[in-house]
Amino acid sequence: SEIKSAHLKEDNLAYIVYLADNIAAFADRRKKEDTEEKGFDLSVPLQSVFNVLNGNNQRFYYQPGDMDDQGKINYPASEKKPFSREFYMKICQRMLDNFRGMNWSEEYLNSLLAVMEANLSYMPSSTSNEELSDISLFDHVKLTAAISSCIYDYLNENHLSYKTELFDKKDFYDRNAFLLCSMDI
Protein backbone atom coordinates (compact mmCIF):
# COMPACT_ATOMS: atom_id res chain seq x y z
CA SER A 1 0.00 0.00 0.00
CA GLU A 2 1.07 3.60 -0.56
CA ILE A 3 0.91 4.40 3.13
CA LYS A 4 3.96 2.17 3.71
CA SER A 5 6.13 4.33 1.46
CA ALA A 6 4.72 7.66 2.65
CA HIS A 7 6.83 9.61 5.10
CA LEU A 8 4.13 10.53 7.60
CA LYS A 9 4.36 11.80 11.16
CA GLU A 10 3.50 9.35 13.95
CA ASP A 11 0.21 11.18 14.62
CA ASN A 12 -0.97 11.53 11.02
CA LEU A 13 -4.71 10.86 10.64
CA ALA A 14 -3.97 8.80 7.52
CA TYR A 15 -3.10 5.82 9.76
CA ILE A 16 -6.53 6.00 11.39
CA VAL A 17 -8.39 6.37 8.09
CA TYR A 18 -6.34 3.54 6.53
CA LEU A 19 -7.37 1.08 9.24
CA ALA A 20 -10.96 2.36 9.41
CA ASP A 21 -11.33 1.95 5.64
CA ASN A 22 -10.06 -1.63 5.88
CA ILE A 23 -12.55 -2.40 8.65
CA ALA A 24 -15.42 -0.78 6.73
CA ALA A 25 -14.47 -2.63 3.54
CA PHE A 26 -14.47 -5.91 5.45
CA ALA A 27 -17.95 -5.09 6.79
CA ASP A 28 -19.56 -4.03 3.50
CA ARG A 29 -17.82 -6.08 0.80
CA ARG A 30 -18.87 -9.60 -0.04
CA LYS A 31 -17.62 -11.95 -2.73
CA LYS A 32 -19.88 -12.84 -5.63
CA GLU A 33 -20.81 -16.48 -5.83
CA ASP A 34 -19.84 -18.48 -8.91
CA THR A 35 -17.55 -15.90 -10.51
CA GLU A 36 -14.12 -16.29 -12.01
CA GLU A 37 -13.82 -12.65 -13.11
CA LYS A 38 -10.84 -10.65 -11.88
CA GLY A 39 -10.01 -6.95 -12.03
CA PHE A 40 -12.23 -3.90 -11.85
CA ASP A 41 -15.03 -2.44 -13.96
CA LEU A 42 -15.46 1.30 -13.40
CA SER A 43 -18.69 1.26 -15.42
CA VAL A 44 -20.53 -1.06 -13.01
CA PRO A 45 -23.67 0.56 -11.52
CA LEU A 46 -24.81 0.24 -7.91
CA GLN A 47 -26.90 -2.88 -7.41
CA SER A 48 -29.89 -3.18 -5.11
CA VAL A 49 -29.17 -4.76 -1.71
CA PHE A 50 -32.40 -6.70 -2.20
CA ASN A 51 -30.84 -8.66 -5.07
CA VAL A 52 -29.41 -11.23 -2.65
CA LEU A 53 -31.45 -10.61 0.51
CA ASN A 54 -33.28 -13.68 1.86
CA GLY A 55 -31.79 -15.92 -0.80
CA ASN A 56 -32.96 -13.77 -3.71
CA ASN A 57 -31.07 -14.04 -6.97
CA GLN A 58 -32.16 -10.86 -8.74
CA ARG A 59 -30.40 -8.34 -10.96
CA PHE A 60 -31.65 -4.81 -10.27
CA TYR A 61 -29.46 -1.74 -10.72
CA TYR A 62 -29.64 1.94 -9.87
CA GLN A 63 -29.27 4.30 -12.79
CA PRO A 64 -26.14 6.48 -12.79
CA GLY A 65 -27.23 9.65 -11.05
CA ASP A 66 -27.39 11.59 -7.84
CA MET A 67 -30.02 12.60 -5.31
CA ASP A 68 -32.52 14.48 -7.43
CA ASP A 69 -33.43 18.03 -6.34
CA GLN A 70 -36.85 17.46 -7.89
CA GLY A 71 -37.62 14.74 -5.34
CA LYS A 72 -37.61 11.90 -7.86
CA ILE A 73 -36.45 8.61 -6.39
CA ASN A 74 -33.91 6.54 -8.29
CA TYR A 75 -35.56 3.13 -7.94
CA PRO A 76 -33.53 0.10 -9.03
CA ALA A 77 -34.52 -1.36 -12.40
CA SER A 78 -33.61 -4.42 -14.43
CA GLU A 79 -31.88 -2.28 -17.06
CA LYS A 80 -28.14 -2.09 -16.39
CA LYS A 81 -26.92 1.37 -17.47
CA PRO A 82 -23.14 1.63 -17.15
CA PHE A 83 -21.36 4.50 -15.43
CA SER A 84 -19.20 6.56 -17.74
CA ARG A 85 -15.92 8.35 -17.15
CA GLU A 86 -17.77 11.59 -17.90
CA PHE A 87 -20.30 10.85 -15.15
CA TYR A 88 -17.53 10.31 -12.60
CA MET A 89 -15.83 13.53 -13.74
CA LYS A 90 -19.11 15.45 -13.41
CA ILE A 91 -19.60 14.20 -9.84
CA CYS A 92 -15.98 15.04 -8.94
CA GLN A 93 -16.31 18.54 -10.34
CA ARG A 94 -19.63 19.17 -8.57
CA MET A 95 -18.15 18.02 -5.26
CA LEU A 96 -15.05 20.19 -5.72
CA ASP A 97 -17.27 23.19 -6.46
CA ASN A 98 -19.30 22.50 -3.31
CA PHE A 99 -16.17 22.05 -1.21
CA ARG A 100 -14.72 25.37 -2.40
CA GLY A 101 -17.71 27.23 -1.03
CA MET A 102 -17.64 25.41 2.29
CA ASN A 103 -16.38 26.81 5.56
CA TRP A 104 -14.35 23.93 7.03
CA SER A 105 -15.62 24.13 10.59
CA GLU A 106 -17.66 21.93 12.89
CA GLU A 107 -20.81 23.87 12.01
CA TYR A 108 -20.47 22.76 8.39
CA LEU A 109 -20.32 19.00 9.06
CA ASN A 110 -23.97 18.60 8.10
CA SER A 111 -23.29 20.48 4.85
CA LEU A 112 -20.39 18.14 4.08
CA LEU A 113 -22.60 15.14 4.82
CA ALA A 114 -25.34 16.52 2.53
CA VAL A 115 -22.86 17.06 -0.34
CA MET A 116 -21.51 13.53 0.04
CA GLU A 117 -24.99 11.99 0.25
CA ALA A 118 -26.27 13.91 -2.78
CA ASN A 119 -23.36 12.87 -4.96
CA LEU A 120 -22.30 9.41 -3.76
CA SER A 121 -25.54 7.62 -2.82
CA TYR A 122 -25.89 5.85 -6.17
CA MET A 123 -22.20 5.18 -6.78
CA PRO A 124 -20.90 1.71 -5.79
CA SER A 125 -18.14 1.56 -3.18
CA SER A 126 -16.56 -1.40 -4.95
CA THR A 127 -16.08 -1.90 -8.68
CA SER A 128 -14.28 -5.22 -8.25
CA ASN A 129 -15.53 -7.95 -10.57
CA GLU A 130 -15.16 -10.39 -7.67
CA GLU A 131 -17.46 -8.50 -5.26
CA LEU A 132 -21.09 -7.49 -5.06
CA SER A 133 -21.58 -3.81 -5.88
CA ASP A 134 -24.56 -3.16 -3.62
CA ILE A 135 -23.12 -0.78 -1.02
CA SER A 136 -22.96 2.88 -2.00
CA LEU A 137 -19.77 4.88 -1.75
CA PHE A 138 -21.67 7.28 0.53
CA ASP A 139 -22.51 4.49 2.99
CA HIS A 140 -18.94 3.17 2.88
CA VAL A 141 -17.45 6.64 3.49
CA LYS A 142 -19.90 7.31 6.32
CA LEU A 143 -19.02 3.98 7.97
CA THR A 144 -15.30 4.69 7.52
CA ALA A 145 -15.77 8.09 9.20
CA ALA A 146 -17.66 6.57 12.14
CA ILE A 147 -14.98 3.91 12.66
CA SER A 148 -12.24 6.55 12.31
CA SER A 149 -13.89 8.64 15.01
CA CYS A 150 -13.94 5.67 17.39
CA ILE A 151 -10.29 4.80 16.70
CA TYR A 152 -9.26 8.44 17.14
CA ASP A 153 -10.99 8.67 20.52
CA TYR A 154 -9.55 5.31 21.66
CA LEU A 155 -5.97 6.20 20.72
CA ASN A 156 -6.12 9.68 22.26
CA GLU A 157 -7.82 8.48 25.44
CA ASN A 158 -5.05 5.92 25.92
CA HIS A 159 -2.22 8.25 24.77
CA LEU A 160 -1.15 5.86 22.00
CA SER A 161 0.85 6.52 18.84
CA TYR A 162 -1.26 6.28 15.69
CA LYS A 163 1.50 4.75 13.57
CA THR A 164 2.80 2.32 16.18
CA GLU A 165 -0.61 1.04 17.26
CA LEU A 166 -2.31 0.90 13.87
CA PHE A 167 0.45 0.22 11.41
CA ASP A 168 3.58 -1.19 13.03
CA LYS A 169 1.82 -3.51 15.48
CA LYS A 170 -0.59 -6.02 14.03
CA ASP A 171 -2.87 -6.59 17.03
CA PHE A 172 -5.28 -3.64 16.94
CA TYR A 173 -8.05 -5.87 15.54
CA ASP A 174 -7.87 -7.87 18.78
CA ARG A 175 -8.47 -4.83 21.01
CA ASN A 176 -11.79 -3.92 22.59
CA ALA A 177 -11.74 -0.46 21.05
CA PHE A 178 -15.37 -0.36 19.91
CA LEU A 179 -18.75 -0.49 21.59
CA LEU A 180 -21.77 -1.02 19.37
CA CYS A 181 -25.06 0.08 20.91
CA SER A 182 -28.59 -0.39 19.69
CA MET A 183 -31.86 0.78 21.19
CA ASP A 184 -35.48 1.48 20.47
CA ILE A 185 -37.23 4.58 21.71
Indicate residue ranges for each PLM-predicted region:
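Regulatory/sensor and coupling segments of signal-transduction and defense proteins
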Residues: 1-185
